[in-house]
Regions:
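A short SAM/SAH-binding and catalytic strip from SAM-dependent methyltransferases
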Residues: 96-108
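C-terminal alpha-helical "lid/dimerization" subdomain adjacent to the S-adenosyl-L-methionine
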Residues: 20-21, 52, 132-182
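A short glycine-rich, Lys/Arg-flanked "PGG" loop and its adjoining helix->strand segment in the class I
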Residues: 110-122
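Class I SAM-dependent methyltransferase SAM/SAH-binding core
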Residues: 43-86
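A short acidic, Gly/Pro-enriched loop at the edge of an enzyme's catalytic core
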Residues: 85-97
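Conserved beta-strand signature within the Rossmann-like core of class I S-adenosyl-L-methionine
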Residues: 124-131
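Conserved alpha-helix/loop element of class I SAM-dependent methyltransferases that forms part
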Residues: 22-39
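N-terminal, positively charged/glycine-rich alpha-helical extensions of SAM-dependent methyltransferases
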Residues: 1-13, 146
Length: 207
């Protein structure tokens, strides 16, 4: 999987782009994801600028992201530079792991899933919120056309074409979540789709 060197060039616009590509529903969907969390500690995986900050006020949060410039805008008190494929934490460290709108940008999701399982406490939850393509083939084509135009246009006007082209292509990196995410044998799973055409999914894993 070919990733851009980093998202440092677009860190100031990253949250705005999430809002645009989710038709303005990203904040309400983040809140919906947070409502599925257990009480206690949360690892905000690939936290970026900390867009889930307002939804996690009542939790003990550790924000982790590979990009220091993203973390420089992050409001969480505890911030760590790191990758999901190699989490710098002991086993059974967290009551929850939360990952919003970035799972498709993780290079080795199988490794990341194993690491998440390792750091979750027994009974802990992994809450995954992300975008995908619609199931219906006709709607999938329409979604591809719409996101192609939108993300390439944003890339051109911000002069960061490579990063936004990557975000467009990342929607096709993995199979449908109902197939891709069911490969893990250690965590029970429940998936809900919402948004126009069902292009956003919420997956709730329990250890």
């Amino acid at each position: 999987m070919n990733k851009p060197a980093n998202f440092s060039n677009i860190h100031k616009y990253y949250d705005l782009i999430n809002t645009i590509t989710t038709l303005g529903f990203d904040k309400s969907w983040r809140s919906q994801a947070a409502r599925n969390l257990n009480p206690g500690s949360v690892l905000d995986l690939v936290s970026g600028t900390g867009a889930s900050y307002k939804d996690l006020n009542n939790f003990d949060v550790t924000a982790l992201d590979p990009d220091e410039q993203m973390l420089s805008l992050n409001k969480f008190d505890r911030k760590i530079v790191g990758r999901g494929e190699d989490l710098p934490f002991n086993e059974n460290s967290f009551d929850n792991v939360l990952c919003c709108f970035v799972w498709r940008n993780i290079s080795e999701t199988e490794k990341a899933m194993n690491e998440i399982y390792r750091v979750l406490k027994p009974g802990g939850k992994f809450i995954l919120l992300d975008m995908t393509r619609p199931k219906n083939s006709t709607l999938r084509i329409l979604h591809k056309i719409g996101t192609f135009i939108l993300l390439h246009f944003i890339g051109l006007i911000t002069m960061n074409f490579k990063e936004y082209r990557f975000l467009y292509k990342s929607l096709d990196f993995y199979p449908q979540p109902e197939i891709h995410l069911n490969k893990n044998e250690y965590l029970s799973l429940d998936i809900t789709r919402f948004g126009l055409f069902g292009f956003v999914y919420l997956a709730v894993f329990t250890k």
